[in-house]
UniProtKB/Swiss-Prot annotation:
<dbReference type="Pfam" id="PF00291">
    <property type="entry name" value="PALP"/>
</dbReference>
<dbReference type="InterPro" id="IPR001926">
    <property type="entry name" value="TrpB-like_PALP"/>
</dbReference>
<protein>
    <recommendedName>
        <fullName>Cysteine synthase B</fullName>
        <ecNumber>2.5.1.47</ecNumber>
    </recommendedName>
</protein>
<keyword id="KW-0808">Transferase</keyword>
<dbReference type="InterPro" id="IPR005856">
    <property type="entry name" value="Cys_synth"/>
</dbReference>
<feature type="binding site">
    <location>
        <position position="259"/>
    </location>
    <ligand>
        <name>pyridoxal 5'-phosphate</name>
    </ligand>
</feature>
<keyword id="KW-0198">Cysteine biosynthesis</keyword>
<feature type="modified residue" description="N6-(pyridoxal phosphate)lysine">
    <location>
        <position position="45"/>
    </location>
</feature>
<dbReference type="GO" id="GO:0006535">
    <property type="term" value="P:cysteine biosynthetic process from serine"/>
</dbReference>
<comment type="pathway">
    <text>Amino-acid biosynthesis; L-cysteine biosynthesis; L-cysteine from L-serine: step 2/2.</text>
</comment>
<keyword id="KW-0028">Amino-acid biosynthesis</keyword>
<dbReference type="GO" id="GO:0005737">
    <property type="term" value="C:cytoplasm"/>
</dbReference>
<dbReference type="GO" id="GO:0004124">
    <property type="term" value="F:cysteine synthase activity"/>
</dbReference>
<feature type="binding site">
    <location>
        <position position="75"/>
    </location>
    <ligand>
        <name>pyridoxal 5'-phosphate</name>
    </ligand>
</feature>
<feature type="binding site">
    <location>
        <begin position="178"/>
        <end position="182"/>
    </location>
    <ligand>
        <name>pyridoxal 5'-phosphate</name>
    </ligand>
</feature>
<comment type="similarity">
    <text>Belongs to the cysteine synthase/cystathionine beta-synthase family.</text>
</comment>
<keyword id="KW-0663">Pyridoxal phosphate</keyword>
């Protein structure tokens, strides 16, 4: 029987879980990566983007034809632009101007209006401008950083998928932290199944810049973040994240972004401390969004 989907939105989720073959080396551990770049708009953010819009509709907060606003470093914006196109919303996205050309082009390809702030203003400036536009009546901010529908998407989809795909054998979960929606939702689900599962978050070390994740100043810390749901936070240098990202492509055939390289680098570090463990890391997007930045240039 031919499988048909009503819309592209119905293709979000149920992404593959793949075992790493070469990077782990000799080990008794099983190292797995979840390929979120296989989602229609190319990242893990497809899940919360649809969740935030759909649940807001169900509450009566928005309806097709409205204008939605969001500050983004890239992936959420692309996912929201796709979701808005499917559901009939106007989308205003605000992002730092040092984001890659591929991300900007993807957003406008879906029909979103793109507003750039300076790299000095960064994501903090983008978030402030989004709030300002909402106060001025330009539209409604979805606010992925404070919106409970963000982690709920992962509680109801990503977490259960990982549990099912590992047959409940997962011992460690590793995820980069930006809005923290992925790690919050997955942690809640996995800990309900087995409180012994260890949740490991990744953030850039001081002075490092890894696209899509941040060391947030206290006043901008995502409101959805609950530190008690994370057992360990790993600080990662961008050089290590980029090195593992390139090795994933060349040794495993997995073409991903820098924060995904960081998550796998953290998983590899962790694996060296363990025996007979089952580790899962999130590959949150695809590498084609980073080509213009030069991170994949021959070295």
């Amino acid at each position: 029987m031919t499988v048909q989907y009503p819309t592209i939105a119905d293709c979000v989720g149920n992404t593959p879980l793949v075992r790493l073959q070469r990077l782990p080396g000799e080990t008794s551990n099983t190292l797995l990566v979840k390929l979120e770049g296989n989602n229609p708009a190319g990242s893990v953010k497809d899940r919360p983007a649809l969740s935030m819009i759909t649940r807001a509709e169900l509450r009566g907060d928005i309806r097709p034809g409205d204008t939605l606003i969001e500050a983004t470093s890239g992936n959420t914006g692309i996912a929201l632009a796709m979701a808005a196109a499917i559901k009939g919303y106007k989308m205003i996205l605000i992002m730092p101007d040092n984001s890659t050309a591929e991300r900007k082009a993807a957003m406008t390809a879906y029909g979103a209006e793109l507003i750039l702030v300076s790299k000095e203003e960064g994501m903090e400036g983008a978030r402030d401008l989004a709030d300002k536009l909402q106060r001025e009546g330009r539209g409604k901010v979805l606010d992925q950083f404070a919106n409970g529908d963000n982690p709920e998407a992962h509680y109801h989809s990503t977490g259960p998928e990982i549990w099912q795909q590992t047959g409940g054998s997962i011992t460690h979960f590793v995820s980069s932290m930006g809005t923290t929606g992925t790690i919050m939702g997955v942690s809640r689900y996995l800990k309900e199944q087995n409180p012994a599962v260890q949740i490991v978050g990744l953030q850039p070390m001081e002075g490092s810049a890894i696209p899509g994740i941040r060391r947030w100043p206290q006043e901008y810390l995502p409101k959805i973040y609950d530190a008690s749901r994370v057992d360990r936070v790993v600080d990662m240098h961008q050089d290590e994240a980029e090195d593992i990202m390139r090795r994933l492509a060349r040794e495993e055939g997995i073409f991903c972004g820098v924060s995904s390289g960081g998550a796998v680098a953290a998983m590899l570090r962790l694996s060296r401390e363990l025996e007979n463990a089952v580790l899962v890391a999130i590959i949150c997007d695809r590498g084609d969004r980073y080509l213009s930045s030069g991170v994949y240039d021959p070295r």
